[in-house]
Regions:
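Conserved class I S-adenosyl-L-methionine
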Residues: 1-37, 39-46
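Conserved SAM/SAH-binding loop
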Residues: 49
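Class I SAM-dependent methyltransferase SAM/SAH-binding core
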Residues: 53-96
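A short acidic, Gly/Pro-enriched loop at the edge of an enzyme's catalytic core
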Residues: 99-107
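SAM-dependent methyltransferase
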Residues: 121, 137, 141-205
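A short glycine-rich, Lys/Arg-flanked "PGG" loop and its adjoining helix->strand segment in the class I
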Residues: 124-136
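C-terminal lobe and adjacent flexible extensions of AdoMet/dcAdoMet transferase-like proteins
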Residues: 201, 205-241
Length: 241
């Protein structure tokens, strides 16, 4: 099966069952780390159906969302139109950002573990491209998995979403995470793969490309340092002058 294909069933099962309260927390974190009016233009890389892009636009940001999934972008445009929100949604490949969007932006966000899909060199180049699309002093905000969490939490588990029992198998090999999702006999499975980065590793990569670390935290809480006890961490970088 193709990894990281994100089936329609995946969107229905995981994206659309995300807590509105958690989405609001993520968006509020972005707004604190990139406050208006100093930061206004936002590029949301791997925006999906606009879960973050639309509420950021509702806050007054000038938002461009980029994703490779045309169906997800169609849903994002429909939802934005229904809400009367002005946001642009562009189809494109995160490996070649300049082919689809033109900077500079004040902010680039890549949230909900949407970074690390490729090999180490390609991932680093994507981070470089995101930084290059920022104005001097612009900020890049990443929300990514902590490899230490998965080092201690591998194996198989069953969850229930939308009345469906789903088996999730998670395996970490070095820093490569593979997640297999079995929806049952009536649906094709999904596979997700990522390269994961420790806080220090991703900060070192960012520094190589002129991005200084402003903040590393977890739970979208500036007072909480990243820890292997928590699945996610947020990092804020600033493009140096």
């Amino acid at each position: 099966m193709e990894a990281n294909a994100y089936s329609r069933l995946w969107f229905e099962t995981f994206l659309r069952t995300q807590s509105p309260e958690w989405t609001a927390r993520e968006v509020a974190f972005v707004a604190r780390q990139a406050p208006q009016p100093a930061y206004r233009t936002v590029l949301d890389v791997c925006c999906g159906e606009g879960r973050h892009a639309i509420p950021l636009a509702e806050r007054g940001y000038d938002v461009t969302g980029l994703d490779r999934d045309g169906a997800a972008l169609f849903a994002a445009r429909e939802r934005a139109a229904d809400l009367g929100v002005a946001a642009r949604f562009v189809e494109g490949d995160m490996r070649d950002l300049a082919a689809s969007v033109a900077g500079p932006f004040d902010v680039c966000v890549c949230l909900w573990q949407s970074f690390g899909y490729f090999d180490a060199a390609t991932n680093e180049d994507i981070l470089r491209q995101m930084g290059d699309l920022l104005r001097p002093g612009g900020r890049l905000i990443l929300d990514i998995y902590h490899p230490g969490f998965y080092a201690a939490h591998q194996g198989e588990r069953t969850v229930e979403r939308n009345g469906r029992a789903i088996t999730i198998s998670e395996r970490l090999n070095a820093n490569h995470l593979t997640v297999d999702i079995d929806y049952g006999p009536d649906a094709a499975p999904d596979r997700m793969e990522w390269e994961l980065y420790t806080p220090g590793a991703i900060q070192t990569i960012a520094a190589r490309h002129g991005l200084r670390t402003v903040l590393a935290c977890t739970l979208c809480d500036e007072t909480q340092l990243p820890t292997p006890d928590m699945i996610r961490m947020q990092l804020v970088f600033e493009r140096m002058l």
